[in-house]
Amino acid sequence: MRIFYLILCFICLCDLLHAQTVRISYEGDPLTDKERRKIEQTLQYEVEFYAQFGLPDTLNLQLTVFNKREDALVYLNKFNIHPPKSTNGMYISRLQKAIILSREKEYQQGLGVIYHELSHHLTLQITAGRPPIWFNEGLAEYFEHCKV
C-alpha cells in the first residue's frame, strides 16, 4: 500500500511540474470582471491546445485595450506604429503585446478580437517566432470564433 501512495504522490508531483502558468497583465481602459473571466477562460482553452505543440510552461501576456481608437493611435505612435484604418486589434511581437484599438459595440465580437490577438502570441511561442502567415492567421481566426 505504501508503494501505491508513493507512486501516486510521484505522479501528482510530475503533473504539477508540467502545469502551465500563464500571467496576463491588463493595461489601457478597464475591463469588467465578467470580461476578464471570459478572456481567461478562453485563454486557458487556447493554452491547452498550444501546450500539445511545445508551449513553454510559463508565459507572460500583455493585453492593452482602448475604448477609443484615438487613444490607441496616440499610444501606438510612441512606438512608431501606424495601423490601417480597418484594424481593430493587433499583436506586436517585438513588444509582446496584444493591443485592441477600440472596443466593438457588440460584446462577443470585441472579445473575439481579443482571443484572436492572444492566439498570435501563443502561435509565435510554438514556432520560434516564424510561423507561416496562413497558419498564424488560421489559428487566430479559429480562436476568435470559438465558443468556450
For each feature predicted by the language model, list its residue ranges.
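Sec-dependent N-terminal signal peptides
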Residues: 3-13
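Alpha-helix boundary/capping residues
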Residues: 11, 46, 79, 146-147
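Proteins with a high burden of low-complexity, intrinsically disordered sequence enriched in S/T/G/P/A and R
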Residues: 14, 51, 147-148
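Sec/Tat signal peptide C-region and signal peptidase I cleavage site
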Residues: 15-19
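Juxtacatalytic substrate-recognition/specificity segment
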Residues: 20-132
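Post-HExxH zinc-binding segment in Zn-dependent metallohydrolases
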Residues: 130-148
